[in-house]
Amino acid sequence: QTNHKMMISSAKPLAIGLFTFTLIAYICLTNRFLADDFSVSYVANHSNSLLPWYYKITAVWGGHEGSFLLWVLIFSVWTVAVAIFSKGIPEVMVARVLAVLGMVSIGFYLFMLLTSNPFESLLPFYPVDGADLNPLLQDFGMIIHPPMLYMGYVGFSVAFAFAIAALISGQLDST
C-alpha cells in the first residue's frame, strides 16, 4: 500500500516536470531560430537570417520536427492542467489519468528522439545562411493556426485518458 501511495503522490510532480522540461526544449529551439544558429539542421532548413523575428518564432513549427515538438509541448500543457485543476476528482483517478497521459508522452518522446529530433546538428560543416521558411507559411494565419488547432486536437487526449482510467478502475458510472 505504501508503494502505491508513493506512486500516486508522484504523479502530479512528474506531470509538472514533463511540462517544465518540454518547455525548456521548446524555448531552446526557439532561441536557436532567433539566434540564426544554422548548425542545427532544422533551423538551417526552415529559416534564414533575413526572416523577420515573428516568422522565426513561427518557423519553429514550420516543419515536421518542430511541429511535433509543439504538439508535445501542448500535450504537456494539457497534462499539467489535469494535474493542477483536478482537485474535485479522487487522487487515485487523477493518478491513473496522469499515468495514461504519461504513457502516451513516452511514445511521443521516443518517436521524437528516434525519428524526428529537431536538435540534430550539422556540425562540423553548416551553411552560412538558412534555406528559408516556406513562403506559404509566411502568413499571419500560420502564426495562430497551428497552436490553436493543436490545442483542440491534443485536448482530446485528456478525454481519452479519463476514459481509459475509468476502464482500468472499472468505474463506468457517475460515482
Feature map (PLM): residue ranges:
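Polytopic transmembrane helical bundles with strong interfacial aromatic enrichment
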Residues: 1-175
